[in-house]
Amino acid sequence: VCINRDFGDWQPRRGALEQVMARIRPATFVLEPGVYKDKLPPCHVVEMRSDMDRTAYEKMKKDYLVELGGAEITALTAAAVTSKLQQMAGGWVYDTVSEASDKAGVFKSYKYAHWFSTHRFDMLDEILEGNQQDNTILVYNFVEELAQLKTRYPHLWTLDDGADVVKRWNDGQIKLLAVHPKSAGHGLNLQYGGNKMVFLSLPWSLELYEQTVGRIHRGGQERDVWVYVMLTNKTIDERIWSALADKRAISEIALEELKG
């Protein structure tokens, strides 16, 4: 049942989950992490909350437009404003500018980031200092976040920095590794190089979130895993985090149904 078409919010009809589980149970074998292999260490998830001046944020939320740095930034659809609100929760927002090209009737589009708050990166500095420079994975969702990470932390590595990045990380040679959830999925083993991960912003997909955490919380990890989730109070961050928690609850119920 669609409960919010603008934002793509759906929830199962009453009894639908039980019906689906009953259909697939005969052909399903549930393998829980750590039950048939070595036990996994605990995974601690810590909410790192901060505040910001929400004047521009509330303006975008209400009017689908805001003026920053002399530019009028607009969102044409509810889906577009959702993305911009997530950006603004991080202290910045994209502005798309179109310019005429050499070909008649053809325009080129460019994205520019307008920054109005550094609260999130200031908190990231505190987290990294508190971690005593332990090897840490930084998870980003937007290119601008990666650009800012590279500016603030020149020793930062990404998975695109060479074929041996994973090996160097697992050998303890990389202090900071930036990954995107879509590039840190199934089959990537990062558990030997560190046990700490910071989500600069969150994906909407529970699978992407869990698979990203699973790069360090997996067989072979010998230390407790610490996952820091950065949230700006009274913004869409809280809604995304709540949505992930709800989806996780449904998936846990589904697993219980399959076991029954």
Regions found by a protein language model. Name each.
Residues 1-119, 125-134, 227, 244-246:
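Inter-lobe coupling linker of SF2 helicases/translocases
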Residues 2-3, 29, 53-54, 88-94, ...:
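Short, solvent-exposed loop/turn segments at secondary-structure junctions
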Residues 135, 155-156:
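Residues that mark the start of a beta-strand
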Residues 135-142:
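Conserved RecA-like ASCE P-loop NTPase motor core of nucleic-acid helicases/translocases
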Residues 146, 156-247:
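Conserved RecA-like P-loop NTPase helicase motor core
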Residues 148-151:
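Short amphipathic alpha-helical segment within the helicase RecA-like ATPase core
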Residues 255-260:
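Long, largely alpha-helical accessory region at the distal end of helicase-like NTP-driven motors
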